[in-house]
């Protein structure tokens, strides 16, 4: 027989109800018309029960439609009903199906009504399990009342706390009697709506434990965790069917591609001080979004007075740090008896294979075996624990021992050994035991680093005119154009309208430059002699660092005349030209625009919208904290080489990029690294990508393979709430959609300026320069591409490099390329958007056709009220919007959005469409495939052509009403318009509105299935479709 076990652990911070600053709480649990209760804890606002209540379930499938009601009462001594202390409702659909998957969780107590004064939380452990034996039946209500009376009797006789144990022992007799009762008729009670606990409160106390799993989670249950404490908010159930104008649930997609909520043991859930979390201090939340990982740190600082080991009278020392089978080596220093290494080694506590640390000093020998110099043994049981913000541990001198364990006469080594966590400042630069097979030269490719994008600016060049151009052919008037090169960017003006020696262009060209301004702007005036043949008439070199910076809207810098230098002129000729003081000239207005934001991402998921100038940036409004916890079920990316995957993560928000350390040969890596960003605009997106490191041991020209990517919009996150989920890592390949694993993240957005954050929604998305002096649309995509290339080039030159393929994947360089799959996705989005309008039209049609007479009568009444009192129309509309918004609040999304395979049309894309999407530009496919795709595009274009033609026809018919193209139709229309003008003038507006409204809402008995007269008249109007060839 299947059982439901509800373990009541404890409660904390309950509301005092007895008038003396205390309460005597007990817990009553009801499930499927079965009711049980715990013992009473007298005068205790933080009671502990540790009692298990068992209920009959029967079929586990019934859990999905059931609710577990947990209510806390104050046990009163005056034979009156207990006072309400709070309640919790838990949906049966989220109850774990085994004890191993369950964990102790803390639930905030909910109010019974709007004016209830309730606080505190309760710790529960709930799970379903098959248990052999007879059925267990909950006691009837009358027996429960008997138990309560017995408790009250004992409380009145033995109210002092020293006799409390006797009360508990006596109550156990009643509990045994309850367990041995026969099945009795339970009391019927209407099942109320259930709410599911999913999220984590940042202010309340409690740690993380394994949460109840939803139906989506049961397909991929998270690994069991240790029991822990947590604080959760409540989640409303799904919307009822048949509701009008409520949010439509998304289409169900493959459970494999869905989000899975987790509950890792994070320190952020153990906080109980509201002020501590609401202060927004960065240091207060350091490393509270990740699980603590303990490491043994060994800092090898230096050695002194080492003995001579070579015949030449010197030694080449290095240090070997050994712990079990793990061995780390320092670099060897040639001919140095007092070496200084300053290297740190980190050994994971989970993989400690010995209780004795061995540090050996050896002499490097190229020909024979390395010589033994001395060693030190350290017992790990005596290693101190250090956790920041503690000061660094001071290193100590250790005298070296020989192979027999005797102290040597010469040689000492300075070491510092401590046990710490990943929050230690030595963690990023330490040699890790899980990277033991990585050479020292490639060790930097596996470490965590923080990068910053270069500061980008727009360079504006206004080409105005040139004077005194001198072509090579004296009798020819030049056809001049201006070519400008800034870095690897090249632009050119159009040819002037008139060919002359003093041409004018008046064109503005935009470029992207970055700090430090090391580029040179090359402006050349060319004479277009023929197709593909240009002759340089002169050019000028302008250093970008000498260009004035324009901060914001204001006066443009004055244009300047620049001397054009002849391209083929030698130095002597140039000096002679300067003596003559004659040269061709060009008039340019050049400035660096600091008031714009340089777009290096798509505007749909941009992470930064601040202007380039630091002086124009607004203060931050919040803090974004990201905990990169772990991943699971990763695909072996190096399976062809007999290896698994060397994964690392990259996160990008604003101009800050972070890269986690690389974990070798791991399909379920655990990083547990936390990073922080300042937030200036909540309507931004953070991007996290997972990659396979192909340069662990000098991978050459191999590219780091992409495993998957996650994007989260900050505006969809609640403030001061911790989100922990497994995100699917989806990659679209020519063979179809592929899931490469799941990434576990912890996210928290903390608001530091509530007023500024709310005011941000009324401000422009981009700096005001984008609206006052907008950049032409045809230039934006080109400038964005150039900005992406500059960022990728600059980050690839860092050490260790953030490689170009990683940056391009994070920035979605190819997002603008044509994709039939993406086109279908956009069309599906439009149809989903218009579905609401379709539902409204269908609802109105049902009203007009009297499908529901009661609803139609109510609409008649409402219509007459609004016509008689038109001043109520706008208040009614806005009140309706308010009510709908409040109604949908119960069904608001409780999970952050993620990259949806169904919305992207990626789970059922045709293979040929994917092959076309991954095709190069220009195409590299055979001619027959290109012909087939062209024919398909023609077919799609024909359908679009038909729809556009129909829209044009309707518009032209409207124009034909007064154009006299059809004299009879126009005459009828203007006579009709005259009659209606007179009728409306002499008739009150309310009467006209009532007549029109009642006519539209008339009963079907007064309707005809034939088209109406206005529709017939409109369809007979002429259009230009018959004029087309």
UniProtKB/Swiss-Prot annotation:
Disruption phenotype: Enhanced late-flowering phenotype of the ftip1 mutant.
Keywords: Calcium, Cell membrane, Cytoplasm, Endosome, Glycosyltransferase, Membrane, Metal-binding, Repeat, Transferase, Transmembrane, Transmembrane helix
Domain of life: Eukaryota
Requisite cofactors: Ca(2+)
Annotated positions binding Ca(2+) 2: 310, 363, 365, 371
SMART domains recorded: C2 (SM00239)
Main localization, broad class: membrane
Domain C2: 1-111, 277-398, 437-562, 605-727
Subcellular localization(s) per the UniProt record: Cell membrane; Cytoplasm; Endosome membrane
Regions annotated as coiled coil: none
GO cellular component: cytosol; endosome membrane; plasma membrane; plasmodesma
Membrane spanning residue stretches: 864-884, 976-996
UniProt KW Transmembrane keyword: yes
GO biological process, one term: positive regulation of flower development
Family matches, as PROSITE patterns: C2 (PS50004)
Region (Disordered): 187-224
Membrane association type: Multi-pass membrane protein
Function: Regulates flowering time under long days. May function as a signaling molecule by regulating the trafficking of other regulators.
Family designation: Belongs to the MCTP family.
Protein name, as recorded: Multiple C2 domain and transmembrane region protein 6
Organism expressing this protein natively: Arabidopsis thaliana
């Amino acid at each position: 027989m299947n059982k439901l076990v509800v373990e009541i652990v404890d409660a904390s911070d309950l509301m005092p109800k007895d008038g003396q600053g205390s309460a005597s709480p007990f817990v009553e649990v009801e499930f499927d018309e079965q009711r049980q209760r715990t013992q009473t804890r007298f005068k205790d606002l933080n009671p502990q029960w540790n009692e298990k209540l068992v209920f009959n379930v029967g079929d586990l499938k019934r859990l999905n439609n059931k609710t577990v009601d947990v209510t806390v009462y104050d046990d009163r001594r005056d034979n009156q009903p207990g006072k309400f202390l709070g309640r919790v409702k838990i949906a049966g659909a989220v109850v774990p199906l085994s004890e191993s998957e369950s964990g102790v969780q803390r639930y905030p107590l909910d109010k019974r009504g709007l004016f209830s004064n309730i606080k505190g939380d309760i710790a529960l452990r709930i799970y379903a399990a098959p248990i052999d034996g007879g059925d267990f039946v909950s006691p009837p209500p009358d027996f429960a009342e008997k138990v309560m009376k017995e408790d009250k009797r004992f409380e009145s006789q033995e109210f002092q706390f020293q006799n409390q144990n006797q009360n508990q022992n006596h109550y156990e007799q009643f509990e045994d009697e309850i367990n041995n009762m026969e099945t009795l008729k339970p009391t019927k009670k209407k099942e109320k709506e259930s709410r599911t606990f999913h999220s984590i409160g940042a202010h309340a106390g409690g740690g993380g434990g394994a949460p109840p799993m939803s139906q989506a989670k049961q397909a991929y249950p998270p690994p069991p965790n240790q029991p822990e404490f947590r604080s959760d908010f409540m989640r409303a159930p799904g919307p009822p069917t048949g509701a009008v104008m409520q949010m439509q649930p998304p289409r169900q997609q493959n459970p494999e591609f869905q989000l899975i909520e987790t509950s890792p043991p994070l320190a952020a859930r153990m906080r109980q001080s509201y002020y501590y979390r609401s202060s927004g201090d960065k240091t207060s939340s350091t490393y509270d979004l990740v699980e603590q990982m303990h490491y043994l740190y060994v800092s090898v600082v230096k050695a002194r007075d080492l003995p001579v080991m070579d015949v030449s009278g010197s030694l080449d020392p290095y240090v070997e740090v050994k712990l079990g089978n793990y061995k780390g080596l320092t670099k060897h220093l040639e001919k140095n008896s007092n070496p200084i290494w300053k290297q740190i080694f980190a050994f994971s506590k989970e993989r400690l294979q010995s209780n004795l640390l061995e540090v050996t000093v050896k002499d490097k020998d190229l020909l024979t075996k390395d010589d033994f110099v001395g060693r030190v043994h350290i017992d790990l049981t005596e290693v101190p624990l250090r956790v920041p913000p503690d000061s660094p541990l001071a290193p100590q001198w250790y005298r070296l021992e020989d192979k027999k364990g005797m102290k040597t006469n010469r040689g000492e080594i300075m070491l510092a050994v401590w046990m710490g966590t990943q929050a230690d400042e030595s963690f990023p630069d330490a040699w890790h035991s899980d990277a033991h097979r990585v050479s020292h030269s490639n060790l930097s490719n596996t470490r965590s680093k923080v990068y910053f994008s270069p500061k980008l600016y727009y360079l504006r060049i206004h080409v105005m005119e040139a004077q005194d151009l001198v072509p090579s052919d004296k009798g020819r008037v030049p056809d001049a154009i201006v070519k400008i090169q800034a870095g690897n960017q090249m632009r050119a003006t159009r040819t002037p309208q008139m060919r002359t020696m003093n041409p004018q262009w008046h064109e503005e060209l935009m470029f992207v430059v970055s700090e430090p301004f090391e580029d040179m702007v090359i402006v050349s005036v060319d004479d277009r002699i023929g197709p593909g043949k240009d002759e340089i008439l002169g050019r000028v070199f302008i250093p970008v660092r000498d260009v004035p910076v324009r901060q914001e809207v204001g006066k443009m810098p004055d244009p300047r005349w620049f001397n054009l230098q002849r391209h083929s002129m030698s130095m002597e000729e140039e000096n002679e030209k300067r003596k003559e003081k004659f040269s061709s000239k060009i008039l340019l207005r050049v400035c660096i625009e600091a008031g714009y934001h340089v777009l290096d991402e798509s505007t749909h998921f941009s992470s930064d919208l601040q202007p380039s100038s630091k002086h124009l940036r607004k203060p931050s409004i919040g803090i974004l904290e990201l905990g990169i916890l772990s991943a699971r079920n990763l695909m072996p990316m190096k399976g062809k080489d007999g290896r698994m995957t060397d994964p690392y993560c990259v996160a990008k928000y604003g101009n800050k990029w972070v890269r986690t350390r690389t974990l070798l040969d791991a399909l379920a890596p655990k990083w547990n690294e936390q990073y922080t960003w300042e937030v200036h605009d909540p309507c931004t997106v953070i991007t996290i990508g997972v990659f396979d490191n192909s340069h662990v041991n000098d991978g050459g020209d191999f590219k780091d393979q992409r495993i998957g990517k996650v994007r989260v919009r900050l505006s969809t996150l609640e403030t001061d709430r911790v989100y922990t989920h497994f995100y699917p890592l989806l990659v679209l390949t020519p063979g179809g959609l592929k899931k490469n694993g799941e990434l576990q993240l912890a996210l928290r957005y903390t608001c530091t300026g509530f007023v500024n954050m709310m005011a941000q929604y009324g401000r422009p998305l981009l700096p005001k320069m984008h609206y006052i002096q907008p950049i032409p649309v045809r230039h934006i995509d080109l400038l964005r591409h150039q900005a992406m290339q500059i960022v990728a080039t600059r980050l690839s030159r860092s050490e260790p490099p953030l490689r170009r393929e990683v940056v391009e994947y994070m920035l979605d360089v190819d997002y603008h390329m044509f994709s039939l799959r993406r086109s279908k996705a956009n069309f599906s989005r439009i149809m989903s958007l218009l579905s609401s309008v379709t539902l409204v039209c269908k609802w109105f049609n049902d009203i007009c056709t009297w499908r529901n007479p009661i609803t139609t009568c109510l609409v008649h009444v409402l219509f007459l009220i609004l016509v008689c009192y038109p001043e109520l129309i706008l208040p009614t509309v806005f009140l309706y919007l308010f009510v709908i918004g409040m109604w949908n609040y119960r069904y608001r999304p409780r999970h952050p959005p993620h990259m949806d395979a169904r919305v992207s049309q990626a789970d059922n894309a045709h293979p040929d469409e994917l092959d076309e999407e991954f095709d190069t530009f220009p195409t590299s496919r055979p001619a027959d495939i290109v012909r087939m795709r062209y024919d398909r595009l023609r077919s799609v274009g024909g359908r679009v052509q038909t729809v556009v033609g129909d829209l044009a026809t309707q518009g032209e018919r409207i124009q034909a009403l007064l154009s006299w193209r059809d004299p009879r139709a126009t005459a009828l229309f203007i006579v009709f318009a005259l009659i209606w003008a007179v009728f409306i003038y002499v008739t009150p507006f309310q009467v006209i509105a009532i007549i029109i409204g009642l006519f539209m809402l008339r009963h079907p008995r007064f309707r005809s299935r034939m088209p109406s007269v206005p529709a017939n008249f409109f369809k007979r109007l002429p259009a230009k479709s018959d004029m087309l060839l």
